[in-house]
């Protein structure tokens, strides 16, 4: 980029992309007092939900709770625009409980635009960014070698406008060189109806950032009026009173609707088998990897050939639209065959397809090129967040957007970044996975990915992260006061339950014994009662032993804390033990190739990722416990040798 380029405007921070990551990043930086510009190709499609019109689900809901606990937006908007809510995994333990909301996608986007337009320090710009302006400077590094430092200076648009910035956050989603496929036909697009971002990928390569290619897909939409609902199972809203947000002022005034369930048939499966060669993947037109945990219907038929039927959900896209999202039925088959397939499903034999399913392949930045702060290793003050980092899902994107936004502001303020660890949050689990693992398929957060899932529940996200959100400056005084009041009530109730004792001769004790079939020997506290597997806080209410007017979230928190007290203490001890070892730092100048005591795979992977500490090193594929022990010994020898050298130099200087 030429130095004489005239500057249109200057900002502290520029965000490239108006999806869920971009919106969280821009709102975060603007709220923290930094002049911010959000650039997007289409201002009418801000925070769009191009795939399923839903927020939450297993592990994803935990992410949404965490973003909200820190002061983010996605949870509030999901609550306000929800047209159906359900608790998933309700019959299992609290570690895997998950809230899922069906949202009105147009209302969600509309409200996000309103928030952006009314946020101080934030400007919205419709433009395609094609080039990043990088400043280079030579500095003296280790061993007196000259090192070229690169720093972001600004951005250039397709039509030649230049905007300077102290920091840039890329949140381009699936738009970098995006291409959508239906059968063997393709066109350049970031998603259906929207042009792909051209030029920026090549520019990233020129400045030293590698990109690779991934694939995802979305199902067809059908006309609600053409569905025979009598042939379907109904799935009503069952958790309208549950919220992602911990903000007590959040309300939902949307009508609640039902989703419906159908299933694939033998005709569906045969039609897919007969036409596999016409799909982009099985036909060999593309070879990009798609999401493992959201496979196309053809993948399901091929990989699970023994299954006679697959469940399909029909989900409304909003209150004022006839469009129904056919969840679990994404495909890359030609349009005419898609309609044939849909009509093999019960309830859809006369359906009209409003939008065809399609596959989309796009460029992404392998996140091993990022630091834990989401700043790129190659270029200072350049951050990357969202689907461009190889993730899939609005929730994963929103969480990364908030992290990148926070750390971009801290970098400009010369403060250390906020590092989210695996032990503290699902956000930390996700980021650690992204930057330490060589992922070859879109990444989805899962409860099974966390070693600490009982500690990292959705219900306690505020207890884990709201103090940090307040410290950062994203939680206002009103919200902080509500949090402090909740903590006070929670601790008071746990103390009351511990101190309130029932004798087995009390009338209420006899009633409890009769109802539960469990004896009270001598006496017991309410806390001990609550520890029983089949006794819950609702039972305390039933027997008039509960504190009156205590909110549901406090009742739930108290019960989980008490019922799982032993497990939680054990997990806390494990975390503290790991932290003592994992915090030991690893100098960035180490050349692991020269450490002979490490395995070859460990040397290669450690050199590639350059972990900051033992905790990060322990999570790198191919690095065994034996490698970590060898590395620890090597560091001790290195420190001893350094001390000897220093003593020798001091003696030489004094002689």
UniProtKB/Swiss-Prot annotation:
Chief location: cytoplasm
One Gene Ontology cellular component annotation held by this UniProt entry: cytoplasm
InterPro entries: FAD/NAD-bd_sf, GIDA_C_N, MnmG, MnmG-rel, MnmG-rel_CS, MnmG_C, MnmG_C_subdom, MnmG_C_subdom_sf
Keywords of the record: Cytoplasm, FAD, Flavoprotein, NAD, tRNA processing
Protein localization: Cytoplasm
SMART domains with a match to the protein in the record: GIDA_assoc_3 (SM01228)
PROSITE patterns: GIDA_1, GIDA_2
Cofactor (UniProt): FAD
One GO biological process term: tRNA methylation
GO MF annotation, one: flavin adenine dinucleotide binding
Residues engaged in binding NAD(+): 290-304
Source taxon at top rank: Bacteria
Binding site for FAD: 17-22
Subunit structure: Homodimer. Heterotetramer of two MnmE and two MnmG subunits.
Function: NAD-binding protein involved in the addition of a carboxymethylaminomethyl (cmnm) group at the wobble position (U34) of certain tRNAs, forming tRNA-cmnm(5)s(2)U34.
HAMAP family reported for this sequence: MnmG_GidA
Family designation: Belongs to the MnmG family.
Entry protein name: tRNA uridine 5-carboxymethylaminomethyl modification enzyme MnmG
Lineage: Bacteria, Bacillati, Cyanobacteriota, Cyanophyceae, Synechococcales
């Amino acid at each position: 980029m030429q130095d004489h380029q005239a500057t249109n405007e200057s900002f502290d921070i520029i965000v490239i992309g108006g999806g869920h990551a971009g919106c969280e990043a821009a709102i975060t930086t603007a709220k923290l007092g930094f002049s911010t510009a959000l650039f997007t190709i289409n201002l009418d499609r801000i925070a769009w939900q191009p795939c399923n019109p839903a927020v939450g689900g297993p592990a994803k809901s935990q992410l949404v709770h965490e973003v909200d606990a820190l002061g983010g937006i996605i949870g509030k908007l999901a609550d306000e625009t929800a047209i159906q809510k359900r608790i998933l995994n309700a019959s299992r333990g609290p570690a895997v409980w998950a809230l899922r909301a069906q949202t009105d996608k147009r209302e969600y986007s509309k409200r996000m635009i309103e928030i952006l337009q009314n946020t101080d320090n934030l400007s919205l710009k419709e433009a395609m960014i094609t080039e990043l302006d990088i400043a280079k400077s030579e500095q003296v590094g280790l061993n007196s070698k000259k090192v070229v430092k690169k720093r972001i200076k600004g951005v250039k648009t397709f039509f030649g406008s230049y905007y300077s910035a102290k920091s840039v956050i890329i949140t381009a989603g699936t738009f970098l060189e995006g291409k959508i496929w239906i059968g063997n036909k393709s066109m350049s697009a970031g998603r259906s109806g929207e042009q792909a971002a051209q030029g920026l990928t090549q520019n990233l390569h020129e400045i030293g950032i590698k990109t690779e290619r991934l694939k995802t897909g979305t199902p067809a939409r059908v006309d609600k009026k053409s569905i025979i609902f009598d042939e379907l199972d109904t799935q009503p809203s069952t958790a309208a009173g549950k919220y992602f947000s911990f903000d007590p002022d959040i309300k939902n005034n949307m009508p609640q609707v039902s989703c419906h369930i159908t299933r694939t048939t033998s005709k569906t499966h045969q039609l897919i088998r007969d036409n596999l060669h016409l799909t982009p993947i099985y036909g060999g037109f593309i070879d990009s990897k798609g999401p493992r945990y959201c496979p196309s219907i053809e993948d399901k038929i091929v990989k699970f050939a023994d299954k006679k039927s697959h469940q399909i959900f029909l989900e409304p896209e909003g209150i004022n639209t006839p469009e129904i999202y056919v969840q679990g039925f994404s495909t890359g088959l030609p349009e005419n065959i898609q309609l044939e397939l849909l009509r093999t499903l019960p309830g859809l034999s006369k359906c009209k397809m409003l939008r065809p399913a399609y596959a989309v392949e796009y460029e992404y930045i392998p996140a091993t090129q990022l630091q834990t702060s989401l700043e790129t290793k190659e270029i200072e003050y350049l951050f990357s967040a969202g689907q461009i980092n190889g993730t899939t899902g609005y929730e994963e994107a929103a969480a990364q957007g908030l992290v990148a936004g926070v750390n971009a502001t801290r970098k400009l303020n010369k403060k250390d970044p906020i590092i989210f660890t695996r032990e503290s949050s699902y956000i930390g689990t996700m980021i650690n996975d992204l930057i330490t693992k060589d992922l070859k398929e879109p990444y989805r957060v899962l409860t099974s990915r966390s070693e600490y899932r009982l500690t990292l529940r959705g219900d306690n996200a505020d207890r884990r992260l709201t103090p940090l959100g307040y410290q950062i400056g994203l939680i206002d005084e009103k919200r902080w006061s509500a949090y402090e009041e909740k903590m006070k009530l929670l601790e008071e109730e746990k103390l009351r339950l511990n101190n309130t004792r029932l004798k087995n001769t009390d009338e209420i004790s006899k009633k409890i014994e009769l109802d539960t079939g469990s004896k009270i020997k001598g006496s017991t506290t309410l806390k001990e009662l609550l520890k029983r597997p089949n006794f819950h806080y609702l039972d305390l209410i039933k027997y008039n032993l509960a504190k009156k007017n205590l909110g549901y979230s406090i009742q739930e928190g108290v019960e989980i804390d008490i019922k799982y007290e032993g497990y939680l203490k054990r997990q806390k001890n494990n975390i503290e033990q790991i932290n003592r070892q994992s915090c030991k730092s690893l100098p960035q100048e180490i050349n692991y190739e020269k450490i002979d005591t490490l395995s070859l795979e460990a040397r290669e992977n450690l050199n590639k990722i350059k972990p900051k500490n033992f905790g990060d090193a322990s999570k790198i594929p191919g690095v065994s416990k034996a490698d970590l022990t060898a590395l620890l010994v090597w560091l001790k020898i290195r420190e001893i040798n350094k001390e000897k050298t220093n003593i020798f130099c001091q003696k030489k200087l004094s002689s």
